[in-house]
Amino acid sequence: MSEIKDIVVQGLWKNNSALVQLLGLCPLLAVTSTATNALGLGLATTLVLTLTNLTVSALRRWTPAEIRIPIYVMIIASVVSAVQMLINAYAFGLYQSLGIFIPLIVTNCIVVGRAEAFAAKKGPWLSALDGFSIGMGATGAMFVLGSLREILGNGTLFDGADSLLGSWAKVLRVEIFHTDSPFLLAMLPPGAFIGLGLMLAVKYLIDEKMKKRRAETAPSAVPAGETGKV
């Protein structure tokens, strides 16, 4: 149970692929102009990570070490192609919005890295959990960044949610404030870099505060031989 908890905590927070490892920055910065796009690409990446880790782990005993990386890439490409066709079939609006960034998941360092570092050494179910946790950690970072950029840039949240969830999701759109001239800095790549930098700073402050709190609540160690001395 402790191993499962550690995998989840590492993926979601301590070893977050976007906020700690800083992997997959190209789609993170390019696609997160809206919360819907960020959530769509994040969930697609999570599905690819989970299925890839599961497959790599299941085949690890029959994968020659000398050619393991090309095999991993073939597995990842196959999974990404399947996910791309699913999005094209059931969320065509999102498919058009994400464009080239769906097939580019194949080259994402997160996917290859987890296959090599974890799935090739652990069992299928732990590997699938690792992929899911890492993917949800990345999805959370994308969603927060996309939400901030959409709110600051257009004054809305979940604009275009129907392209991801269907026509019923039009009711999710929220207009936080009305603007006739969008704040372009938030919508362009420089705004994405600034937003990511602020998120990194906030995570660092939270980690430092938690570390300080643990140090204050930890029982002080008594040196050997000091007990009973006046």
Curated annotation (Swiss-Prot):
Transmembrane segments: 18-38, 39-59, 63-83, 86-106, 125-145, 182-202
Gene Ontology, cellular component aspect: plasma membrane
Pfam family, one: Rnf-Nqr
Localization per Swiss-Prot or TrEMBL: Cell inner membrane
Source superkingdom: Bacteria
Signal peptide extent: none
Keywords associated with the record: Cell inner membrane, Cell membrane, Electron transport, Membrane, Translocase, Transmembrane, Transmembrane helix, Transport
GO biological process: electron transport chain
EC number(s) stated in the UniProt entry for this protein: 7.-.-.-
InterPro entries: NqrDE/RnfAE (IPR003667), RnfE (IPR010968)
Top enzyme category: translocase
Family the UniProt entry places it in: Belongs to the NqrDE/RnfAE family.
Biological role: Part of a membrane-bound complex that couples electron transfer with translocation of ions across the membrane. Required to maintain the reduced state of SoxR.
The protein, known as: Ion-translocating oxidoreductase complex subunit E
